[in-house]
Design a protein with these regions (language model features):
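Extracellular and organelle-lumenal recognition/adhesion modules and their flexible linkers in secreted
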Residues: 2-289
Length: 289
């Protein structure tokens, strides 16, 4: 049996913000011979973004608010710099701003702008109650960066470092921002050792701006390279724990993420595909982002 149907399709570079969807044709072929009854007694799992089950949980990214989209309108305790520390040592001078002109993605327009008049100065992300680092693990860092249009420098160095419980760097790499256009910077940092034992319980990611100038940055991420069966961007120990349950089905989305506070805040599957930069950030009723 062939059933012509219409599905909503959103290309990676085009996401309707008004709730309307674009359409494309999809033809599905169903084989009656393959139909079988479904048991009414199945063991399954249910996903709702509560108790940090999404970001801070299954999501392997250790950075919280890496897109600088947290804001007071979503939660009275939030700001665009929530979970970031601004570090300006004695003798240094720097200003930290949040801008929206010419962003990486219109869907998530806010980005940080760090103007350093007397170096050094740093931004430090503490993740979810601190970052856990393991011996022998490699952590992949990425961020979109550019030299601000009001800065005359042609190249600005930035040091990326993993910070331990005592505030010391246990791995670091230097990158160079050398364009007035947004470019994705990527670097890997490996913690010494081979045991995979936890060596840092309340660590952080530190970005240090070592010369005078202004750098814009957005979509900062840090992920451990270890995966479960090659499944990237998911925390391997939690995925394994779910797989060990041997569920026959998964309910998603579940709970109040389904309806949210209204049409604009409810779960829209078509806004969760494509490049992550173009997926609109949102908050939920459990006060997660």
């Amino acid at each position: 049996m062939t059933i012509p149907t219409t599905v909503s399709v959103a290309p990676a570079d085009e996401y309707p913000a008004d709730g309307h969807t674009m359409t494309d044709k999809l033809t599905a072929t169903l084989d009656k011979a393959g139909v079988r009854a479904i048991s009414t007694d199945l063991w399954g799992i249910f996903f709702e973004d509560i108790s940090y089950s999404g970001d801070g949980g299954l999501n392997a990214d250790l950075v919280q608010n890496g897109a600088f989209e947290y804001n007071r309108a979503d939660s009275i305790d939030w700001s665009n710099y929530s979970f970031w520390r601004k570090i300006v040592p004695a003798g240094s001078f720097a200003a930290f701003d949040v801008l929206t002109d010419n962003p990486v993605a219109e869907e998530n327009p806010h980005y940080a702008s760090v103007e350093v008049e007397q170096a050094p100065a740093s931004l430090e992300n503490i993740g979810w109650d601190g970052m856990v680092f393991r011996a022998g693990e490699t952590y992949d860092f990425s961020a979109w960066m550019r030299i601000s249009s009001n800065c005359e420098a042609s190249a600005l160095p930035v040091t990326v470092a993993l910070i331990d419980d005592d505030g010391n760097a246990i791995a670091e790499q230097d990158i160079t921002v050398d364009s007035n256009d947004w470019r994705k910077q990527e670097v890997s940092l490996t913690v010494s050792g081979e045991s995979n034992a936890i060596v840092v319980h309340e660590g952080a990611l530190r970005l240090t701006f070592t010369t005078e100038g202004t750098v814009d940055l957005d979509f900062v991420t840090l992920e451990p390279r270890t995966t479960y069966n090659g499944l990237k961007h998911f925390r391997p120990d939690l995925v394994k724990a779910l797989a060990d349950l041997q569920p026959r089905f998964m309910r998603f989305p579940g709970g109040c993420i389904t309806h949210g506070l209204g049409m604009d805040n409810m779960y829209h599957w078509d806004r969760t595909i494509g490049d992550v930069e173009h997926r609109p950030h949102n908050f939920n009723l459990w006060r997660y982002h």
